[in-house]
Amino acid sequence: MEAKYIDYDETRCFSSTVTRLVAKEDSLKPFINQFPDLKAFKNIISQRKFDGNRDSLVESLIHQYENISTQSTLLKSNIKALGESNTFTITTGHQLNIFTGPLYFIFKIVTAINLARELKSAYPDKNFVPVYWMATEDHDFEEINHTYIGGKKISWKLNATGATGRLNTKSIIQALNEYKGILGISKNAEKLSEMIAKAYADEKNLADATRYLANELFGEFGLVIVDADDKSLKSQFSPIVERDIIEQNSFKNIEESSKKLATINIHAQVNPREINFFYLTNDLRERIVFEDGKYQVLNTEISFSEEELKQEIKENPEIFSPNVVMRPLYQEVILPNLAYIGGGGELAYWLQLKANFDFYQVDFPLLVLRNSAMVADEKTVDKLQKLNLTFADAFVKTEALKKKYVLQHTQHELNLSEEWANLKSVFDDLKLRVQQIDPTLAPSTEAVAVRLKKALDSLEKKLMRAEKRNFSEALNTIEKIKNQLFPGGGLQERKENFGLFYVKYGDDFIPELLKHFKPLDFKFTILH
């Protein structure tokens, strides 16, 4: 593969928050630690105060990997290294989308691995471990029960409740067979089919299935996969859980930050609640609310007095599940983390969280925008070249690109702006004459000019439509290029699964991403 890099704002596909982060806008400084570069990492390494229990972290990970038979030397080394004070993590997180979900799941992890490598080169006396934090406690099954591959939606049909990580994968067989059918029968297809089948077989839970699959894809590169739905890990977080439920500090802190962000035109991505924890059991994840002097679990008969709540948190910390605004704090309490790698939407809500980290005296990580990319096959590249279009052109909206193409290649003048300029000059003279004769007729003159302008605009559109018919073959090719690179009208990485790319490139696919992704350059990557 070869790579081209373009600025994010050239793609017209990213929010203003992303472009402002990439531009290192001063107004964002109160909401971050530092803007990410090698110098910032040097600073944060020296400043990071990690009070978590490293031994407990290592023990939990060893236990979580007990049923993973394929453990690379680098993976084992990284888990062991987490027990040492000179080891830090580079973390990304994601839900347990079936069959890995959209491409950006892969891109997130590749970014984390590459950044860990880059930091090791810069600071060889330290260890840097890439971490994938599985969102095993998330209960939004509708967000993770499907994936798109080759333009087809594959869905896992199940009436699911509770944490998705605890779901049994027995009923996924139909979706699995559909997915395998799209992969085909090539050698690479068979290899991936076998990998996926093993991941979800034997009635595993979804957390174990996802760990297996992510380890098969990334274990050789040292990726450590963390399932934080773990009693030992949660016990380290329980003092904050107790204090936050009772004092409702996160609600106050994050609400205040959201108001401040609104003054610089960054609007809240997440809304904190008075209590930002769920009550979690095998088939239940319900909000905790404070009502009538008691802590009530919604839609149940379960309730606690303040003293009962404290005792429950102490004895059963695993029952208390942080929501989207408290999960990042939990992550930073149990991991010796330096940076969180996320997409634009994720980093936007992290901007709301720094004040809460400061309140609880937990170090806030550097926020690193994940690598975004598009993979173009040879046929698509060929079509672009034949039409003399660049990859940057491909990001122009379809109709605008078609119009641009026609204007560049037509032998006729389709733009009537010169004619309108001439007519406008005539009308300006006419208005002066009318003004001298009867000023009350000036609006009528203006109305005639407006009608004529509309008529010229309409004629210009008709000329363009007529000329487009003369370029129908090229314009149809533009449609095909756009559909290939932007499935469903959006970025490829946000929709298409990695499966068919693995079928095409095999075991070279991820190494090619590792080769070309540059985690601290903050450019959009086009691979072809």
Where would I find each of the regions flagged by the language model?
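N-terminal leader/transition segments
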Residues: 1-70, 93
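Long, compositionally biased intrinsically disordered regions
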Residues: 3, 213, 217-304, 308-311, ...
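N-terminal catalytic cores of NTP/NDP-binding nucleotidyl/phosphoryl-transfer enzymes
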Residues: 85-120, 342
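Glycine-rich phosphate/pyrophosphate-binding loops
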Residues: 102-103, 116-140, 365
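Short acidic, glycine/serine/threonine-rich loops at helix termini
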Residues: 103-104, 140-147, 236-241
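A structural-propensity feature for long, helix-poor, extended segments
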Residues: 141-148, 375-407
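A glycine-rich helix N-cap at a beta->alpha junction
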Residues: 148-175
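A translation/RNA-centric and nucleic-acid-associated enzymatic feature enriched
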Residues: 268-269, 273-338, 344-355, 364-366, ...
